[in-house]
Each structure stands twice: as structure tokens, then as C-alpha cells.
Amino acid sequence: MFYPDQFDVIIIGGGHAGTEAAMAAARMGRQTLLLTHNIDTLGQMSCNPAIGGIGKGHLVKEIDALGGLMAKATDLAGIQFRILNASKGPAVRATRAQADRVLYRLAVRTALENQPNLMIFQQPVEDLIVENDRVVGAVTQMGLKFRAKAVVLTVGTFLDGKIHIGLENYSGGRAGDPPSISLSQRLRELPLRVNRLKTGTPPRIDARTIDFSQLTPQLGDTPIPVFSFLGNAEQHPEQMACHITYTNEKTHEVIRNNLDRSPMYAGIIEGIGPRYCPSIEDKVMRFADRNSHQIFLEPEGLTSNEIYPNGISTSLPFDVQMQIVRSMKGLENARIIRPGYAIEYDFFDPRDLKPTLESKYIQGLFFAGQINGTTGYEEAAAQGLLAGLNAGRFANEEDGWSPRRDEAYLGVLVDDLSTLGTKEPYRMFTSRAEYRLMLREDNADLRLTETGRKLGLVDDIRWAHFSQKVEQIEKERQRLRDIWVHPHSENVSEINALLKAPLSKEANGEELLRRPEIDYRLLTSLTSFGPALTDPQSADQVEIQVKYEGYITRQQEEIEKQLRNENTLLPVDLDYQQVSGLSNEVIAKLNDHKPSSIGQASRISGITPAAISILLVWLKKQGLLRRSA
């Protein structure tokens, strides 16, 4: 052909999932094609101008630890950085950044265009080429056929997307973009379960029409945090403040008086919306006892006058949106630049996926992002990286890889989706992870970078930085273990000055650091224990590892017990009707979910410990009891 049409991996869609998938496959050396309906919207932040948050920031750090793009792009585009839960334990601390939309998109596009093995082509995809239950390519709107060994679908909200503003609606993938109708129809012909979900976005406000003098500013942290393990604060652009306002009784009255004009309450929208990011009309009705709700006014960029009012996502008519906005303090004369809206779209049941995000029914077809029922840039990007990695491995006839629940929030995310499925847009929280003390933001690289290197995702620069950090931490911990003081040491007085009670017996540096009144900075400021590490990441890691060592050891013991079940594999084609002793309900659920391991089966709602015992005995009798390495 006069144009390249043979690839290892094709990625369909250029949002947060698609861009990470494309970068991952290409980093592994696979010839990769990224098909997008518009090159100018690669990495577009379709909703809020922010990255990270509780649970979400953990995913971003994991993406970064595996060589991904999101954290690096955020460091180049972030205009305000904060550590959430900074006063709490390290397991729930999370980084969040406001991002300049234009700079973020530029950072993503620049990375894609400079990635070897990756070709970008602008054309909507209308069909998949499927032969003998295996995907072998894609067909674009103009009839171009591209063939590949694996295909990754990362189409966001575009599949048969329908936008709602009041009682009016029209087809669209998001505001200003067409939907993907033909591809939606094609996917519905495949043996995959499909349903509808809904999400929404608030109106955007002209900053020049806001009276900021009436509002409370919210500043970023000092010193300014960074997202990437390779990042530094010097990469950040100019920093900006957010501002806070509140809804009030007048706001709520406007909403209650116009519920008959809401497509949700009028029954026009059938898709279920996100529980943890509800529309303002939902909040007012669900929390009727609340007199006000906090609204964050977030700048969309350094060169933009648009403000994103985080907390008033709505699909009410435009005139009602104007009343809502102008009912709030500081916004009395505000002007809306873009109306808020809700969007309904197709998603496919993630229980039809393997933990690698490959379809159980169409070989070589991978799904990532909102098509799997998730919500959020971070959740999409994490899935994209995993799907791109596994598409690359599939194309090279290698076994797939997926992290366990005790290894990564990405493991929790994929296990929740592929085991339990979802009936509403799924978002990540730290509370979803049972081993969250092990899954901290600060140790994402220690958990995943070595694996990423083996998988071909981590380049030489990141590997050298990581190796140096590991060596620093190990040497510093050994140094502290080797320094001893006793009650009659020459410098004991400066140590006693920091302690609640004078030193009564000999102790080394690590034992002193375990005391609640001592932190690493204080300890290394003492003559006997200095100098401190200059790298703040390594210094933090030393303190956390020492102070939480007992808790971490106990959690590791719990994990090792659970791994026995996780590593006990179940045959993919097992018909559970054959297993005598299981109830009809358990048989139906196991046949429906098709779990890949005993551990996964045990997390399905309604699968009892007794059922697991019966299953284990049956597997042993049949000679099918196998454990993964």
C-alpha cells in the first residue's frame, strides 16, 4: 500500500486512556498506530482542569512509576499543587494539581509526537475487522483499513453519545465533538454486554464577571509538590489561586422549582450517573437537610478567562443555570461562557474482560477507560497503560500482566471491574484498597518500577534515578542502625531535649526515629546523626519505612495468607454445573463472572467461604488444582 497499513497495535481514541496506551505499546518497541477523530484534542481535559486527589493521585503515581505520561504532563502544566490529607497518615495522603488545559494538551501531544514506534493518524473509526473471533484491524470513516495483531478501544463517552441540556438533547461525543454512531452499532453486534451510563459537567464562567474580593482564596502548598518521581518544582508554570463560594437557600429553591425541566428527573436520561460526583440538582435533593454546598472556582489556565465551578455539574436548562450561578456570593453578575450539560453513552460490562483488559470473547481486543464503566482521567489513564502494555505483549505472543490488589491501586481497579462489574461510573478511593498501607503514593516506584523495567516500559533515565534512590534509602537506613547512643553518651543531652522522657537505655538511630516525637529532619539535625539526605523523596521514604515498619510487616503477613487463594487458578472454560455441592445461586454467579482465580471468586457478592471450600476440594479431586508462579 502507498501508506503504512500494518501495525502491531492500533489504539482507537486519543484521550487519557488512549494516549497512555499508545505510549506504553510504543515504548515496548511495538509498531503502534493511534487513530483519533481530531489530533488537536489529544489529551483533552474534557471536564475539570485537575489531576489527582484521594485515590486518583495514587493512580497517577503508579502510572509514572511504570514510565507513563500523566504525572510528567501535569508537572509541566500544573498551576496549583496541594497535598490532600497532609495531616493524616501516609497511606491516604494524595497529590492534586490544577492544570492549564492548553499546557496539558501540549505536553501530551509533544510526548506522543516524539515517541519512537508511534504513528498518529486523524480519522474516526467506524468498524473493526474481526476474523474467527479475533480482531485483526480497524476501518476508518473514509474506508481506510489498518490491520494489527491487537486493538485497544479507548473511546470515552463517544459511543452513541447523547448530550442533554434541559429537555433538549442532541448527539455528541462531548460538547463540540461528533459521536461515534457506526462504531457503537458495530460493537453491539459482538457478543458483549452493553449498557448506558451518564456523566455531566458544570457551566464555565467568565472570570472577568466574578467579584473575587467577596470570595475566600485557596492557595497551593509551599514548597510546591511535584507529581512525577522524575519531576521538580522548576518545571511548573506560574501558580494561581482557586477561590471558594457556596450555594445557599436561594440556589436550592431555584433548583427545586425547576426539577420538572431536568432531563434526569423528567425520566429522559436513562443512564446512571456518578455517585461521588453528583449533579447539583442531585445534591440538593439527596441532601435536603444541607443549607449550602461548597463550590470551588478553579481557573482553566494562565491565558484563559474561563473558570470551572467545581460542584455545580448540571443538565438543567440554560436559563436555570444562569439563575443558579448568579444566586451565589461573588457571582451575582457572572456570565456563563459554556453551558453545563449531561452526556449519556455506551459502556461495556467489564466482567467480560480478563484482568489484562482483553476481551474474554474477542481475542486481541482490549478495552480501557470510560468504555469499561469508570469515570475520571486518572482511572482512564491507568487502564490505558495496562491495556497498551498487554496489547503489546499479545502482539508479541507473550503472556499478559496485571498487578494484584496488594501491588497497586491499578490492581484494585482492574480486579473490582473484572470481578464485580459496575452499574454506575466507578471512581477510585483509598477506601477501596484493603492493603492501602502498602499502596502509598510515596512508594509507587518501589512497588512497580522494577516490574515496569522488566516489561519494557521504563527507560534508562528513570531506571538510573530509581536505582540511585533505592541505594540511598538502604544506605541511610543502615547508617542510622549503626549509630548508637546510651544514657551516658557525650551528646545525650541534645537527644533528651527532643524526647518526652530522658533516654534510659541504649538505642540506635532507627529506634529513636520510631518514637512519635522524633522525625527524620529533627534526628538528622543532631550532631551524632547528621547529615540528612538531600533528596526529599528518599528522606521521606526512610522516615515512613522506619516509623511504620511494624504495621507494614503485619500487613505483609496478611497479604501472604491471601496470596494462596490469589494464586490458585480456575480453568477459564469451567462449567460450574459440574461442581457438586454448590447452590444454584453460586453456580449462576460463577458461570456469569468466570473468575480467573479462587481469590477473584471469593470477592464475588454471594460467594460464601463454604462455596470456596467445596470448589477447592473439587479442583483437587479432578486434578485441576494449579497455582501460578
Curated annotation (Swiss-Prot):
Disulfide bonds: none annotated. One of its GO terms (molecular function) is flavin adenine dinucleotide binding. It is found in: Cytoplasm. FAD binds at G13, G14, G15, H16, A17, G18, V125, S180, Q370. One of its GO terms (cellular component) is cytosol. Keywords: Cytoplasm, FAD, Flavoprotein, NAD, tRNA processing. NAD(+) binds at residues 273-287. InterPro entries: FAD/NAD-bd_sf, GIDA_C_N, MnmG, MnmG-rel, MnmG-rel_CS, MnmG_C, MnmG_C_subdom, MnmG_C_subdom_sf. One of its GO terms (biological process) is tRNA wobble uridine modification. The keyword Protein biosynthesis does not apply. Its main location: cytoplasm. Its cofactor is FAD. The keyword Zinc-finger does not apply. Transmembrane segments: none annotated. It comes from the Bacteria. Homodimer. Heterotetramer of two MnmE and two MnmG subunits. NAD-binding protein involved in the addition of a carboxymethylaminomethyl (cmnm) group at the wobble position (U34) of certain tRNAs, forming tRNA-cmnm(5)s(2)U34. Belongs to the MnmG family. This is tRNA uridine 5-carboxymethylaminomethyl modification enzyme MnmG.
